[in-house]
Every structure is written in C-alpha cells, then in structure tokens.
Regions:
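Exported/periplasmic cell-wall-interacting domains
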Residues: 51, 65-66, 70, 82, ...
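Surface-exposed patches in mature extracellular/periplasmic domains of secreted proteins
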Residues: 56-59, 86, 162-163
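Cell wall/extracellular polymer interaction/catalysis modules
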Residues: 2-81
Length: 195
C-alpha cells in the first residue's frame, strides 16, 4: 500500500483577491434569469442576466471519466475553504493530506460555491493554467478573481444547470463572440514619387 500524506497541511497565505469582471455576451435562451449554466464541452460558465444576455467565465471541467451533467443549487459559499480530499482521491494520490487549510496553495482557491449535497463545487484554483482544460475530478475551477466575482452575484439557492453542450443555435451565437478578434490590418498609404 502506498505511503499516506500528512493528516494536515497548510494552504498558505490568504491574500485579498480582487473581483475580476467577466465578459457580457449575447445569450438568447430560455434558461432562468439569475441562474448558472455550465457548458462542459465549451468549458464556460454563464450567469444568465436576461433572456438575451449572460456573463461568461472561462472554467476548467472534469477530466475524462469525471465529468457529469444535471441540475443542482448552490447550497453554501465558503471563502478560503479547507479542502478534505475524498478517500478515493487520496487512494489515487497517496501524497494528499486528509485536510488542507484554506489558502493560496489550496486547490479550492479563494472561494467555493457548494453544489447541493454533492462533493462538487464551483471554486477557485491554485493553478490558473488549468482554466480552459478538462483537469478536475468533477468540480468546476475558475480564476480566483472570477469566482469571487460570481460569488458576489449569486445567492444560496441559485440554480445551476450543468450541460454537456449548449443547444446548437446558442452554441453558435456564443462561439461567434469568443473567437479571437481579427488582427487589424495595417493601413496602406500611397507615396507619391518625387518628381
């Protein structure tokens, strides 16, 4: 049997994290206003603002074998949460502690929004490079500034819809807005020849 990690590990400092504003995008849909929609294929989280607009946040999703879909509600919010890796996660990686206190080194980051009575959360991260990838064990990672912003905008009881992909028409509208902007073309000026 592999060697076990320590029972308690420090998560490090807890600096003040400023809110990072998300991008407002066109989001014509029938999803409930005020609700959260998570598109696992697109690796995006949307906070629906109106029947036609949403705030868009890039996220990290569950890696293969750890992704899921369904409906939940936010049951709790915690700033700089402690992390208690589940036994099966500790079995896969015996170096993990039984508990890591909240802090900048903690994988849950600056804030966690707990989803129902499940072990899943929308949370910050200690690894910003994981955003946009399938890298978690089923949770949804955000940049710390983004999760702080989202937490300030939602309440306990907010509905969360996790979908594999958005409906095709909506997916196209959103994709057209997230494509990188075209590089500006240099202006061409004609030079007159000296006479």
């Amino acid at each position: 049997r592999p060697r076990r990690g320590s029972s308690l590990q420090s998560g490090g400092d807890r600096p003040t994290i400023d809110r990072l504003e998300p991008r407002t995008v066109s989001f014509p849909s029938s999803y409930p206003v005020g609700g959260i929609v998570i598109d696992t294929k697109g690796r995006q989280l949307f906070l629906v603002q109106s029947p036609t607009e949403a705030l868009r946040y890039p996220i990290s999703v569950g890696r293969e074998g750890f992704s899921w879909t369904g409906a939940e509600t936010i049951s709790r919010k915690a700033e700089w949460p402690d992390w208690h890796p589940p036994e099966e996660m500790r079995w896969r990686d015996p170096r993990l502690p039984e508990k890591m206190t909240g802090g900048i080194k903690n994988p849950l980051g600056a804030m966690a929004l707990y989803l129902g009575s499940s072990l899943y959360r929308i949370h910050g991260t200690n690894d910003a490079t994981s955003i946009g990838r399938a890298a978690s064990s089923g949770c949804f990672r955000m940049l710390n500034g983004h999760v702080v912003d989202l937490a300030a905008r939602v309440d306990i009881g907010t509905g969360v819809q996790v979908v594999h992909r958005l409906p095709p028409e909506l997916e196209k509208v959103v994709a057209d807005q997230v494509a990188p902007p075209e590089a500006p073309k240099p202006a061409v000026t004609k030079r007159s020849r000296p006479s």
